[in-house]
Amino acid sequence: MSHYHIIGIAGAGMSAIAHLLLDQGHTVSGSDLTANHATAALQARGVQVWRGHDPAYVQGADVVLATAAIRGTHPELEAAAAAGIPRLSRADLWRLWSEQRPVIAIAGTHGKTTTTALTALALRGAGIRCGFLIGADVPALGGSAQWGDPEAPLVIEADEYDRVFLALTPALAIITNVEWDHPDVYPTPSEYTAAFAAFSRQVRDPRRLLVCADDPGALALAGQSEARLYGIDEHIATDPVSCRLAPLDWTASGVTGTATGQQFDLWYYDRRSFGRRLAATVTLAIPGEHNVRNATAALAAAALWGADLRTAVTALAEYRGSSRRFEWRGDVGGITVIDDYAHHPTEVQATLLAARQRYPDRRLIVYLQPHTFSRTRSLWDQWPAAFREAAVVLVGDIYPAREQGDPVALAQSLVDHLIAHGIPARYAGPSALAPSALLAVAQSGDVVLTLGAGDSDQVAAAFLEQCSAMSEER
């Protein structure tokens, strides 16, 4: 067994990897500029986590693990290089695990986290003790990552950022959708699409690639392979490349809302007998049409792996969501607060539609923390349509992540852009002032949604705290 030192261990991806390494019997230490619930969970398992970065932290390590974003001038990387300690990336570990055991990879611009969680839950519900690696905490699975039975598949949320998903050679894969994102890595839509095309070719058996037929970008990839198709309602899809008609292998139909979620019928098309049959009736406790697609993909993957659908469907009914994915944060003063990781216009729109489905008669007050300058600018024309369901949109300063720019000027420009397209928007300022901005507009009966991939979840927490304090004063 080896000692892995992880630089940036507080991040969702790296903290999940740390859990897998611990499950395999390795020793893990790590460092980060911040501490959070992820580092606390690792410390509870005996991991030494340092706040900040220092060359001394790599002493005794056999391997240093760091993301590509951490450059060679980092003090711990320099110390590791001087000591002859090898550096591995996330892609290196994924490649290794993909060689050690079968991998089910969930790729796509949107919906990866939920679909990965649902796939793992479906398999485990059917008695297959799969491992899983997810970029969020999933209470129904007991965390974000577990190694599971090494003979069973490892279900991985296959992130396309920095092309890391190309390190995998999956035994089975899902592509939920393909829509240009991460312009800092993929300057053009064609480069982004090309990466997904390369990923689809790495699936060991093209018949074990599941592609969403409802998404034009994903469906275009299916025309280049023998991929299986899934979607909602339509039983036939038209390939945008060849213009040929293709039957959907898995179809969700008859979607209806329930008091606690939604329900639909799952149909399967047998390519050998050319017959279609009802495979299951599925109940979900999570709202949104996008989650019907996510569940359909997960159940199709489980069925392809040989899982019993009846028990898989039962397991999905217990799923209540993942951290920062339409996560209920609390109710105070008649106001419901939901936090979501949505940071792409399509994700924002899907989240608001899910909120409208669950809360049909309530005003939706949205706080958006735009994530990165490059994404905000590159998807400029898509932002107004994303907020059609919102009563008020509060735009906070840009969360820069790894980029440089003026977070105030671009946020104010986005507000002007939204107003010009008929969206009632206003500038909310830095995240520290956002709770007060929300308090100024939210009223009893409203649903407040905090959206973004930065620290917008802290805005939700602070808003609830301020609301509670005001209620006590009254």
Curated annotation (Swiss-Prot):
Which leading EC class covers this enzyme?
ligase
Name of the featured protein: UDP-N-acetylmuramate--L-alanine ligase
To which pathway does this protein belong?
A: Cell wall biogenesis; peptidoglycan biosynthesis
For this protein, the record's PANTHER family field holds:
UDP-N-ACETYLMURAMATE--L-ALANINE LIGASE, UDP-N-ACETYLMURAMATE--L-ALANINE LIGASE-RELATED
**Pfam families for the chain:** Mur_ligase, Mur_ligase_C, Mur_ligase_M
Biological process terms in GO annotation: cell division; cell wall organization; peptidoglycan biosynthetic process; regulation of cell shape
GO MF entries: ATP binding; UDP-N-acetylmuramate-L-alanine ligase activity
Origin: domain of life: Bacteria
One GO cellular component term: cytoplasm
Which keywords does the record carry?
A: ATP-binding, Cell cycle, Cell division, Cell shape, Cell wall biogenesis/degradation, Cytoplasm, Ligase, Nucleotide-binding, Peptidoglycan synthesis
Q: Which family does it belong to?
A: Belongs to the MurCDEF family.
Q: Which organism is it from?
A: Chloroflexus aurantiacus (strain ATCC 29366 / DSM 635 / J-10-fl)
Q: Where mainly found?
A: cytoplasm
The role this protein plays is:
Cell wall formation.
Protein's cellular compartments:
Cytoplasm
> What is the reaction catalyzed?
UDP-N-acetyl-alpha-D-muramate + L-alanine + ATP = UDP-N-acetyl-alpha-D-muramoyl-L-alanine + ADP + phosphate + H(+)
InterPro entries given in the database record: Mur-like_cat_sf (IPR036565), Mur_ligase_C (IPR004101), Mur_ligase_C_dom_sf (IPR036615), Mur_ligase_cen (IPR013221), Mur_ligase_N (IPR000713), MurCDEF_pg_biosynth (IPR050061), UDP-N-AcMur_Ala_ligase_MurC (IPR005758)
Q: What EC number(s) does the entry state?
A: 6.3.2.8
Q: Where does ATP bind?
A: 108-114
